C-alpha cells in the first residue's frame, strides 16, 4: 500500500486524552507491523472485504502513561461481538455477587425452567460462580453466559453499562436464542458456599433494545436453521454488540483499574479482582473444574492473538488475559498481553470478517485459512514491533 493510503487508513480515535501517534508516525508504525507479517496475511488488513479494525494501547511496565494507535477503526459499523459479550457479562455478575458480600464460592441457580438459548439437559440448576467464570474464560462455553444473563436481568445490565460509560453496548440476546426470547429472564436464587440462600431474584421482563448506532444490516443472505436461504442483507439489530474501543476499555478497567476514570472502574473488591484475573489467564489444560481434554481444547482454542494458529502449548512466559469471539464469519479478540522478561504491557483488540460468500449461518467461513492465522500473526507482529522500536 502506498504511504498516502496508510495515512488515510491508520486512524486512531481519541480515548481519555491519552497520547497519540502523529499521523506520519502512526502510518509508519502500522507499515512496520504489516511488514513483520507474511505478505499474504498482511494483505488481508488492506482488503475492505475483511473489515479489519485494530486498536492498541501499550506502555512500559510500571508506567502510568499509556499510548495508543489504531488501524481502520469504524466505531459505528456493526460486527458480531459474539463471545466477547461474555467479558462484561462476567464482570457485571462479579459486581452483583460482591455487592451482597459474597465471593466466587457463591452458587447461582434458578427456580424456573430455561426460557431460551443454549442450556443442555446436563446443565446444573445451581453452579459455583467460580466454575461459571472458568467455563467462560477457558473455552468460552455458552450456557454460563445464559446463566448470568438470567441472573442479572436485561434492564439492570444496561443501566450499569450506561453508568460505566458504555451506552451503546448491547447485551440483548442469550447465546443461541431466537430473538423473541430475550427480554424475559427467569427467577432464581444465590446461595453461599454452605448452600444457604442469601438472596433471590424474580422473573423480569426487560425493555426491548436494538443496535444503537444506526443500521445493522449486512451480508447477502441468511440460511435459516431449517435450511431455507433468505436473500438480502440480514438485520442484526437485535444481536449483542460492543464497540471495539468499549470492550478494550472494559478489559483495561479490570486489569489496570487505576488507569481509567473512577466512574468506569468495576465495583469488584481487590481480592476478587485478583482471583478473576487468574481465571481469565488460565489455559484449558490448567482447569481443574471442569477438566478439559487438551487435545480438543488446546491453548489457542479460545485465544486468537499470538497462539491462535497453533495447537501447541503457549510459551510459559506469555500471559494472555481477555476474551475472544467468533460468529457468522466475524473473529474478534480483546486481550491484555504480557511476557516475562519484557517490560511491555499491551492491550490489543482487533476483528476481521471472513465470509467470502456473504451468507450467514451456513458454517462456510474462512476461519482456518484466513482468520486465525491473521490474528495470531497480527498479535506477534504488534508485540515485535513495539519491542523493536523501544516503546517499552
Predicted segment positions?
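Short, glycine/proline-biased beta-turn/loop segments that scaffold the active-site neighborhood
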Residues: 99-126
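N-terminal export signals
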Residues: 5-24
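Structured C-terminal helix/loop/strand segments within mature extracytoplasmic catalytic/sensor domains
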Residues: 25-39, 229-392
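Active-site SXXK
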Residues: 80-108, 348
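Active-site-adjacent helix/loop patches that line small-molecule binding or acyl-intermediate pockets
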Residues: 26-36, 124-256
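Second-shell loop/turn segments in exported
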Residues: 74-81, 118-123, 132-135, 143-148, ...
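Residue-level preference for non-acidic, small/hydrophobic
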Residues: 86-93, 136, 161, 247, ...
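Beta-lactamase-like hydrolase cores
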Residues: 25-77, 381
